[in-house]
Amino acid sequence: MQPDRSFQSFASRYRQSSFTYDVKRDVYNEENFQQEHRKKTASSGNVDIDISTVSHHVQCRCSWHKFRRCLLTVFPFLEWMCFYRFKDWLLGDLLAGISVGLVQIPQVLMLGLLARHLIPPLNVSYAAFCASVIYGIFGSCHQMSIGTFFLVSALAINVLRTQPFNRGHLLLGTFIQADFSNTSFYENYNRSLSSVASVTLLTGIIQLSMGMLGFGFIVAYIPEAAISAYLAATALHVMLSQLTCIFGIMISYNSGPIAFFYNIINYCLGLPKANSTSILLFLTAMVALRINKCIRISFNEYPIEFPMEVFLVLGFAAFSNKVNMATENSLMLMEMIPYSFLFPVTPDMSNLTEVLIESFSLALVSSSLLVFLGKKIASFHNYDVNSNQDLIAIGLCNVVSSFFRSYVFTGAVARTIIQDKTGGRQQFASLVGAGIMLLLMMKMARFFYRLPNAIVAGIILSNVLPYLEAVYTLPSLWRQNQYDCLIWMVTFMSAILLGLDIGLVVAVTFAFFIITVQSHRTKILLLGQIPNTNIYRSFQDYREVANIPGVKIFQCCNAITFVNVHYLKRKVLEEIEMVKMPLTEEEIYTLFSQNEEGAQRGKICRCYCNCDEPEPSPRVIYTERYEVQRGRESSFINLVRCSRFESMNTAQTMSEDQVPYITSSSSQRNPNYEEVEKVWLSDDPSRSMTITLPEASDTQVRATKLLPYSTSTILPSIHTIILDFSMVHLVDARALVVLRQMFSAFQNANILVLIAGCHSFVVRSLEKNDFFDAGITKAQLFLTLHDAVLFALSRKLPESSELSVDESETVIQETFSETDKKEESRHKTNRSLIEAPRSKSPGFSLLPDPEMEEESDLDLYSTIQMSKDHGLDLDLDLDREVEPESELEPESELDQETELEPEPEASPKPNRQKYWSLFRAIIPRSPTQTQARTQSVDRRHQNVKPYTSKADTSEDALEI
């Protein structure tokens, strides 16, 4: 059956199609948008809310849906028991339960050999059965097998050293059967069992408290790399512990930091005493299990493995009972235990304080191993586990186990893998395995006493080996994420070198540190505009990104906190080539001094009584000012490109009102040309300077094109900074203080700072922390980045510098001395920089209204007017869409502030916008050039803007 062709061509059809949209709306900032559109809830706490309506009443009622959800959370077994699919899951659960139960029997028998403590195996069996039932009811992992784990029990060796029995031979690795007729042996043995029960009880209480207090959320912050590394280290510890069964030798087992290498050395020293029969049996089991991986069985399309572990346990147990094999088994260990079963008793509460440290260590390791293993298994089957519920479940298991004077229980790594791969789908498999284990231990325990320990070691190593294969994924993990690879290596090495308990603490601490660094190390991108669109992308990603003259756009890609806010400020200052200068004490005092104190400054000492409450300390406006970085005068200059002249005659008068200008031509860029002398241009319009502008010939026009740097353009100075907060979800209180001071400092430097794409949650955070005042209002917050850019372009650009001429192509550089810079910044301290398109903000009343011109030559006219006042007869061409024969007719004007009257538009404005320099040199064109230019203008008139707003007409000054 072939799929529908329409479905196949869906992606191709829509990939080839292009969609356009045309939206007409005003430029919105946060202030006028909230005025026009009503919000559902108040954004600040100082607004009265009418709670008389029914929708605001708190409804405290319990529905059946909520009750059922709460019941299924506390008792997860109800979900799988009520919806159990017998036809699909029953056979797999039975097969997995039989495999797990048969493997658990020899593990219980040989546990005393590894844990160096002799507990009646029937007590451990009863405790394991109760633990499986409890976890089946309260646990959330479907394939988890609960039981004793040697590595967890080995952490209690320090407790056994304080309460030894049998003269401590077990701890030294020598198994000598004690004299049961000695009464002191029973006293020491019972005291040792009481200590183990106390440790297990306190461990369960700690885990139960952690689950009820919700400490399971910590697992959500532990990355997958840390979990994988910890399980790999656990697998390596398990492999090392099984060397006792593989080689048939006993060593003095060590625990704690560097114990891993001490045990390796002890095993190497004991290799001459290794049992060859045990090694051969181990290799036989490994080969059989390896071949078994090639056998594929599926039941109802669910893959399962052949239960080879069942045949190995039953086969070698039967063979060893018929044939005497010279290998290590559990028979000798069972003969050293004085009791076959001890009835449950209440643990001793008097020594809980003595085992507090060991219990806390066991609680961390056992709960972490259970949760990590559960998350790993659940990720394979695409479901989630509840970490808090698992902590409660394992805590109850250990509390119940303490009454049987058993070990601490956790997730058994090898049996969990066996239950998963043999088809176990729900906790019903664990219940089946626990029932089979208890039944066989009560009726047929001696049948398994002669089972070789090497067979059990082969089964365990074969099943935990896949967790160690994660080492092979390190190269790919390094290529994907270096931070995760670093977490993996640190977790693995700490768990190996320092042990599972201390290594766990180090791994979690390091993972939290890396996550904190990643979350607070924000990425600041400099954005530009994709031509003819409202899309803004980073300059590092796209080649056609265009810079907007006078505007810098910074995108913050993370939360802004006290950690990275200074990096944001430093990045902004670097991009706009400015440095921060700390204010002096006199300048800070001037900021905080009140007007009424000016009359009493002459008094040295004043004494008066003031019984009123002390007023709150004034807000720090800013503690530093921003200045252009020294050595980069290009940030302080305005470059204007003029036409080429053959001669220049200047008549000038020196006075204090004149401003120095340096005329730099193309000869300054090339040492082959002669240097240009400095001239003085008058700043007073009453004074004039007469310059003759001869017409350039065709030869000179062609020569102009060959001048070096003749086509270079330099952007105007920065007047607006836009911060894109569309990816910012949090701004803390300290970061808001730094941002507020940064806004004020930039305002003092005549640079306006706008925020775009600010989330409502961040806006409420700004309001709660009193971010807005008379100088910073919501008019500086824009809904989108394009709104902020349009507003920045609608503002009047900085006034262009005076014009001068030279015999060659001339570039005028406006320079100021350091004293003039400081005086200019002081004059502009109280000057505001923002004017909302729709409403005025009260904090910016000192700034005169920007002149919104209908034509696109705002700065051009002021430059032409100055040039005419100084006697400069210039003919500037802005490459605008006008008729070729249209010319600017000179006008004699006495007033410098006279505005240029708007001319009616001859044709619609073009749709394409390109941002270039404001001024270009006019070059007399030949008729051929004029005709070609006219044709390009006609072609550009074919694309018409969908709409034209009066508020954006000043933006045409950047359109060429």
Curated annotation (Swiss-Prot):
Positions of region (Disordered): 807-857, 881-960
Keyword Manganese: no
Cited function: Antiporter that mediates the exchange of sulfate and oxalate against chloride ions across a membrane. Stimulates anion transport activity of CFTR. May cooperate with CFTR in the regulation of chloride and bicarbonate ions fluxes required for activation of the ADCY10/PKA pathway during sperm motility and sperm capacitation. May play a role in sperm tail differentiation and motility and hence male fertility.
Organism of origin: Bos taurus (Bovine)
Post-translational modification: N-glycosylated.
UniProtKB keywords: Anion exchange, Developmental protein, Differentiation, Glycoprotein, Ion transport, Meiosis, Membrane, Spermatogenesis, Transmembrane, Transmembrane helix, Transport
Record's compositionally biased regions (Basic and acidic residues): 818-827
Span list, region Interaction with RACGAP1: 662-957
Ranges of the Extracellular topological domain: 115-117, 161-201, 290-353, 412-427, 475-494
This protein's name: Testis anion transporter 1
Residue intervals annotated with topology Cytoplasmic: 1-93, 139, 244-268, 375-390, 449-453, 516-960
Residue intervals of the STAS domain: 541-792
Residue ranges of the TM segments: 94-114, 118-138, 140-160, 202-222, 223-243, 269-289, 354-374, 391-411, 428-448, 454-474, 495-515
Cellular localisation: Membrane
Main location: membrane
Catalytic activity: sulfate(out) + chloride(in) = sulfate(in) + chloride(out); oxalate(in) + chloride(out) = oxalate(out) + chloride(in)
Similarity annotation: Belongs to the SLC26A/SulP transporter (TC 2.A.53) family.
GO CC terms, sorted: plasma membrane; sperm annulus
GO molecular function: bicarbonate transmembrane transporter activity; chloride transmembrane transporter activity; oxalate transmembrane transporter activity; sulfate transmembrane transporter activity; sulfate:chloride antiporter activity
